[in-house]
Structure formats: structure tokens, C-alpha cells
Amino acid sequence: MCFRMDISVIKGKLVNDFNGIKIGSEKAPKRLIEFINLRCPYCKLWFEESYDTLNQAVTEGKIQRVIKLLDKDKISLQRGNVMHEYIDTDPEKALTQIQQAFETQTIWQDFELEAVAEYAEKTLRFNQQANQILQSEIRNEAEQANIKFVPTIVLGEHIFDESIDEATLKSYIAE
């Protein structure tokens, strides 16, 4: 049996588009808000499977992506929290770093927390960022909106997770 996210409890109106990593034009008519954790295998699946579709929609000016790196208390996801500290605020650089973090996830996914930081610095050559306030804002926003699981994606009235198929995603973007 496949687990399905209960979207009925999520308060989409409490999700904002002003904090997070913004990919694409501010003039785009729609915002695709993505709550992800870099250690989550389902977030990796979402990121990789939606990458081309979202990249095309951003390039065509249809959407602006707002990626919110969500720190989670779950032990396995805390490694993602550490990696979040190393993602740059520059959108293009951040997108590349997120891609690198997901590509190497199987390497660092079981490291001790200190080792994740060392891997980010020494192997991936990421620099630690002063983003604690932003991370706290995103966590508070997720709590207010009752977002419990990652990935959670909000596009207008639509709230979904990584199980969305490409055709449905494209239809939501085109609406």
C-alpha cells in the first residue's frame, strides 16, 4: 500500500513566496513553492523527476520556483539540516548545489552530522552560509501551514508531493 500525504490539513494560504531560493523571474505569473529536505530520498526523487519540466517552465517564464529547505527533527533528516547550512543564497549557484547534494546523497546520507559538514566543505567545496534566520522562518512557516512532510509542493490551489505525474504537473503549470 502506498502512503499518500493528507493535503486536507495543509493551510496553503499560509504559504508565502517571499522567503526561499527563488529560481526564475519575479514577473512569472505563478509561484511553485517547494518544501524539501536534502537528505530525503523522496525530495531527491521529486527534484530529479521534475527537473526538466520545471526548468522549461522557468525558462519560458511560466513559473518562478521558490525552494524552501525545510529543517526537520527526524533523526535521518537532520543530515539534510546540516547540508542546508551550506546552500548559497545566489539562485543559480544554489540550484547547482542542491543538484550536487542530491547526486551525492547516497554517500553522505548515513554520516555523523559533523562528517556531513566536513563533506560539504571539503568534498563539495561549499561554504557555510549565515542562513539561520531564513531556516527558522521557513520552519515556522511550515508549522503555521501544517506542512509535516517533505516534499510538499504548492502551486496555486494545488498541493502535492513527489508522486505527481509529469502530465498532471504540466497541466497545473499551464492552468
Where are these regions (language model features)?
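C-terminal cap of thioredoxin/glutaredoxin-like
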Residues: F35, W46-L54, E118-E175
